[in-house]
A protein has these predicted regions:
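Repetitive beta-architecture junctions, highlighting loop-to-beta-strand starts
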Residues: 30, 44, 125, 135, ...
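Non-catalytic accessory segments flanking enzyme active sites
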Residues: 84-88, 93-96, 120-126, 140, ...
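A conserved hydrophobic secondary-structure block that centers on an alpha-helix together
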Residues: 2-52, 56, 145, 151-152
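Beta-strand C-termini and the immediately following turn/loop, strongest in propeller blades
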Residues: 1, 23-31, 36-37, 72-75, ...
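Predominantly five- to eight-bladed beta-propeller fold
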Residues: 41-75, 85-139, 328-338
């Protein structure tokens, strides 16, 4: 007998509810639509918001043709009054082909758009903000480089600021920017040049206190390290520094103002490819504290209070061990062994 299943809520995967749950946003025939949530007493008549979309210039999350309702790339602002969308124009991009050899009864061919090095025409991005009530569409000027890459990173709680990053095609120069949704003004907060090529796998930008603090990873010193900026783009502090690599962030304690991250190559007694857990104050330079010391690689999960963490450590010749440690790295007890 199965009695643990929850009743179906009626929410389809293509439904993108506003934060106040009064409206539903979706895509149909590549365009944006909105309707009221009848469960909240709203008019469920669908209203079309855009009219210029088409295949490969769509608001759908997937670019394939679809006559029915599908999930959209557009997102709600927190005020539930506006939406924003980053739409890609891939109409001039060349096709790439993939054969599904597992298809039955015969293999099938999938065709899709794909940017490749050397192409003269690649995908172009645009940023739109739409007022759901008035249906006014505002297109913002986000261009800096030809054929740039563009990504929205954070939206302020008051729905008035959009933080985004734009990167040139050569991937050796980028800018962190904020746009004022009310005025359209774009302000560059951080401008970064890293030749010949940026490490895109280690890119890390965290917004704290609704954008008043920004934790930004850079290789400007020749080593990957974290820096603290204020909301205006002014450097406040070098969180980490030295001839070693500050790797992925584990957690950020916004109350205790501490950054927990994995270091590589910091301890000469540990393989530089292994993750070593460290803590650093956001506000005090040269305050990095190493929390794990064994010659193994670590993966940790912190408690909500940051008083304890579960540490899973292993090595190519050592099976995974799971232990509980306090905030200083001292082992409290063994939990599991593979």
């Amino acid at each position: 007998k199965i009695d643990s299943l929850q009743p179906w809520s009626g929410r389809e995967s293509w439904m993108k509810y506003s934060p106040d749950s009064l409206y539903i946003l979706y895509c149909k025939n590549h365009n944006l639509y909105v309707m009221g949530n009848k469960d909240k007493g709203q008019d469920s008549t669908e209203v079309q918001l855009t009219f210029d979309a088409e295949k490969n210039f769509t608001f759908a999350k997937e670019m394939d043709d679809s006559d029915g309702e599908v999930e959209t790339v557009a997102e709600w602002f927190k005020d539930s009054k506006k939406i924003y969308a980053v739409r890609e124009d891939a109409r001039k991009v060349k096709d790439l082909y993939l054969v599904n050899s597992l298809s039955q009864p015969r293999p099938t061919l999938k065709t899709y758009k794909y940017d490749m090095p050397g192409d003269k025409e690649i995908s172009q991005s645009e940023l739109l903000v739409i007022d759901v009530e008035t249906k006014k569409i505002t297109k913002f000027n986000i261009d800096r480089w030809q054929d740039q890459y563009f990504e929205v990173l954070y939206v302020s709680k008051d729905s008035e600021r959009i933080y985004f990053e734009r990167t040139n095609r050569a991937y050796n120069e980028k800018e962190l920017c904020v746009i004022n949704v009310l005025t359209g003004e774009v302000k560059v907060l951080i401008h970064e040049v890293d030749k010949p090529f940026m490490d895109f796998k280690m890119v890390s930008i965290s917004f704290l206190n609704d954008g008043k603090d920004i934790v930004y990873r850079s290789e400007r010193s020749g080593w990957g390290h974290y820096y603290l900026y204020d909301g205006e783009g002014n450097l406040k502090n070098e969180i980490t520094s030295g001839d070693w690599v500050a790797g992925p962030i584990c957690e950020i304690d916004t109350v205790g103002r501490a950054l927990y991250f994995y270091a590589l190559g910091k301890d000469e007694n540990i393989d530089p490819y292994y993750y070593t857990l460290c803590r650093a104050s956001l506000d005090k330079p040269n305050s990095v504290e190493q929390l794990t010391f064994d010659n193994v690689t670590h993966a940790v999960d912190w408690s909500k209070t940051f008083n304890y963490f579960i540490d899973t450590y292993q090595r190519v010749d050592l099976e995974p061990h799971v232990v509980l440690r306090n905030r200083h790295g001292k082992k409290i007890m063994d939990l599991e062994k593979a």
